[in-house]
Amino acid sequence: MTNPKADLLAHLESMAARYQDRWTLSACGVTVGRRSIPALLDKNSNSPGANTASALLISGLSGSADDVALARRALDSTPSDDAGPGNHISLSAIPDCNPDGLRDLSTGYPPIGGFFYNAEEPEKRYLWRWICFLAPTLILELRSGEAVSWQSNEAGSNLASALARSGGRVENESLLDSLGSGSPDGLGPIPGLRLTSPPESLDDELGKLWKLLSEQPGLREASPARQVLEARSARSHLEVAHILASVYGYQLDPVNYTQGVGISGRLQLYELSKTGESPASGIVDLVEPYVSGSTPMFGERVGGANLAGLIWGRELSAATGDPRYSDLIVAVANRYQPGVDGGAPPPCDPDFRTEDMFMAGAMLGRAFGITGETRYLDLLVGFITGGNIQQESGLFWHCRPANFYWSRGNGFAAMGLTETLTYLPENYPGRDTVAAMYRKLMDGLVKIQDPSGMLSQVLDMPGSYQELTATCMLGYSIARGLRRGWLGPSYQAPLDLAWRGVSQRVDDEGNVVDGCASTGVQATLNEYLDRPAVFGFDDRTGGMALWFALEMHRHQG
């Protein structure tokens, strides 16, 4: 055999092509050398209510080529009815967790901070998060050695006992050890076994494990981590919305869309559910200093993100009967002026950034809805169709000088097109062009949606982290499109997948998983890959998740 690490990707591609009904080729991370970490993913691994247990095979943490060769041997035997796990177990694999092999990644878990920009060991962060949210029934680590040995983590001790081959516990702070106790990433533990074996003993040892799992259904129960994820998925759209609305939308300093979307979401939720106390009076108190002028609403430099901080104006007027709040939207829309020589309308960035597609779409569209004046739509349609940053794939560059497929940048484009279509009359000039751009983008994003339902931080970089805000924005845009008849029923499955991924990444306290931090235009691909991912409270992500939940309720109830 050639170096088992060198041609691994081609080997996995071949296996995925040969067994298309079983596997898909994916990626679970990016190395410090900017190589994707390939993963062979069983197509049932993310399926709700699957009748099979899920096992994840991992190897190569130390960088050892012998370990990777052992994992390849295990995978090659899997399709065989005699040696494979059979129909009761879906098997996914990360055969080489450490493709660069620059450092030994065997210990040092859980990784603390630096998601996913750690300069020395980003692989640990990627592996940790990806495995936690795959949440298999069992993790099986393979290591090459001269003698057979089985070890387990705390959660896998019952499996080790049933095998009657226990060699004790794996070492502290190893990946298996840290995943096997407590509440990794706010979920639950995942049982883990480590098999150390010479190649000639591998098939027999694996056969014992597969036979045991086949004969004892109790050992195939969902891991505690998976149980937490499924419980999150089982919540209704309004349940998730109420959780998010209990946390987000209580600040307006600074005046920015990251605050405004949450405030808007709280008002929308009350109108949809009519449960509890209306948030209107509290929001009136929150915004009054700005509305009255006692507190300056904006600083010296005012961009679209600041103007969209007032996105709640029409909803608050509807809730209170006070027209001042709708008037705020009209006032900020009047700040948009025609561009010069085909340029973007100030205060939009002259480079046609996708952020402005959402900000302008939201505020100019609402201004038209309030006043009926088509001059707002003229500005909006000219801007949306004049940027020329949508590519043949349907995806958008971040802006004209930044030819990078940033995930939230495409989310902003999706939201901008969606908001624009929401307000454009059916016969309005340019509507067909906007609708075609919208459908082309939806097609492009759905094609690259991860099996988890998520979009990656950099859309054309397999293994970049699964980013929550962009996935919420995609889901919102699809749900609105299905509800309004802009999209056909084939989009329901990608929408359901997006909701599943998002709902699993919002806990019962409204904490979120991996929302990209505030990001301006970056100069290099690496800078987009290295944008920090927020885990916990994040008003930007929480507000978008709230809007997504509300649109899902409107669409599906």
Map each language-model feature to its residues.
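Extended ligand-binding groove/face enriched in aromatic
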Residues: S292-P401, Y405
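Short glycine- and acidic-rich boundary segments immediately preceding or forming the N-terminal edge
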Residues: M1-P38
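Short beta-strand-to-loop junctions in surface cap/lid or active-site-entrance loops
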Residues: P38-N51
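Inter-helical turn/loop segments and adjacent helix faces that build the functional surface
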Residues: A367-R375, T420-D432, G481-P489
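Active-site/substrate-binding loop(s) of hydrolase catalytic cores
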Residues: T31-V32, G49-S174, G180-L187
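Carbohydrate-binding/catalytic loop surfaces
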Residues: I243-V247, S264-L267, L307-A319, P346-M359, ...
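Oxyanion-binding "anion nests"
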Residues: L202, T418-D460
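CBM-like carbohydrate-recognition segments
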Residues: L176-L179, V228-V240, G249-G260, L272-S278, ...
